[in-house]
From Swiss-Prot:
The gene is ccmE1. PANTHER family: CYTOCHROME C-TYPE BIOGENESIS PROTEIN CCME HOMOLOG, MITOCHONDRIAL. The keyword Heme applies. Residues 131-151 are annotated as: Disordered. This is Cytochrome c-type biogenesis protein CcmE 1.
Length: 151
């Protein structure tokens, strides 16, 4: 093999190794940051993985919110009107968090079927519904509830 061909082959191999390493790093970073969305029905049916960060969303059941008297721990139930799942959270809930409205919780599913959330997202206003929650409600044959009029 002449020296010019050998040099080209080394350059091509170096480029392939570099591209392979870049793709590998990108896939690794994406895999760590992807949080798949699961409905309460999917979680109750065992479709959601345990001890893996997921997003769980639905409507907060009325009367299900329980606040700890001595800490920031809260517990509530989220439903898609077919099945429900309990979510626990330690922290301050968003100002827009209310029973009967849509939320998305990010956390891990434990062995008891409870989502231990480290982040809770509430809808922006009375008409907004997270797209995943809207789709889940539509798939279950329900429509998003209309907001209660205040005043």
């Amino acid at each position: 093999m002449n020296p010019l061909r050998k040099k080209r082959l080394i350059i091509i191999l170096a480029i392939l190794v570099g591209v392979g390493a870049a793709v590998g790093l990108a896939l690794s970073a994406l895999q760590q940051n992807i949080n798949l969305f699961y409905t309460p029905t999917q979680i109750a049916n065992g479709e959601a993985p345990q001890d893996t960060r997921i997003r769980a969303g639905g409507m907060v059941e009325k009367g299900s919110l329980q606040r700890s008297t001595d800490s920031l721990d809260v517990k509530f139930v989220v439903t898609d009107f077919n099945k429900s799942v309990t979510i626990t959270y330690r922290g301050i809930l968003p100002d827009l968090f209310r029973e009967g409205q849509g939320i998305v919780a990010l956390g891990k599913l434990n062995a008891d079927g409870v989502v231990v959330a480290d982040e809770v997202l509430a809808k922006h206003d009375e008409k907004y519904m997270p797209p995943e929650v809207t789709k889940a409600l539509k798939d279950s044959g329900q429509s998003a509830p209309t907001p209660a009029k205040e005043g």
